[in-house]
Amino acid sequence: LRAAKCDLPLVADIHFLPSAAMEAAKHVEKVRINPGNYADKKKFAVKEYSDSDYEAELERLHEAFTPIVLRCKELGRAMRIGTNHGSLSDRIMNRYGDTPLGMVESALEFIRIAESHNYYDICLSMKASNPKVMIEAYRLAVSRMLASDMHYPLHLGVTEAGDGEDARIKSTIGIGTLLNDGIGDTIRVSLTEDPVYEIPVAQALAKKATQLWESHEAIDPQADEQNKDDIDPYSYTRNLTRTIELNSEFKLGGNQTPKVILKTQHPIHQYETIIQDVCKTQLNAKDCLLYTSDAADDRDS
């Protein structure tokens, strides 16, 4: 690549072998470390860690991770600490479970070790194949970093997205939601296709985000804490509301299934036609609230 006069920075993605990371750091601009398998093993073992046991494990982790930190610092290399939801270590799984919190804590352990050596050329990623888990993990990571006065860049991505339209939608949900939050500094759209097809999707997402960011003033995430609402953006819990009865058959709010409200010109007894027109497919109308536009106007009044 260098002989071909390609001067783009290269990233070595390392799993399992610290020795490979040590060698890669000599040749590339950035080394990616997976906290789940760099120094810990994945044997799906169930173990109850006492606080002293856990501290001993962190000391072992410190010894294993320090050499690559010092190598990157010496050579002026950057590092991505990239947590993957599918490869959390047994130690993290036993303490935090298979959760976004476990993903974040796994990365923060490595960051603290790096910072103990005054090494800060770090970016983070919190990838998962489930966009819901991925979004929650990144938001939680930002919150935890702000609380610790950390301001590391974030690399966004949805792992194992697949191919075709579904994969593009899946990646857009995960990456696009976070970009809309103002979160993300680099992005990767992972498709099980020729990698060249990943680029247009990523470019479209980046362009949309840039347009959005340029059209709004920058937001200080720590400013005006008192104006926050009661919704926790770092976990998926339903907002509590009271139940409203529209009539004897239909209730809204509380623990009721979310209802679908639509405007239609068809008589209400033609509900199958209404559903097909709107959804272009046959659906079960059991949990849908359907009424004519006239009825909607009456109830709105």
Q: Locations of the language-model features?
A:
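Catalytic alpha/beta core domains of metabolic enzymes, predominantly
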Residues: S52-L61, M93-D232, R238
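Alpha/beta enzyme core
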Residues: A3-L8, F16-M79, T83-I122, S129-A147, ...
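Conserved small/polar residues in nucleotide/adenosyl-binding loops
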Residues: Y291-D298
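Structural preference for beta-strand elements that scaffold enzyme active sites
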Residues: D7-V11, K30-R32, G76-R80, D121-S125, ...
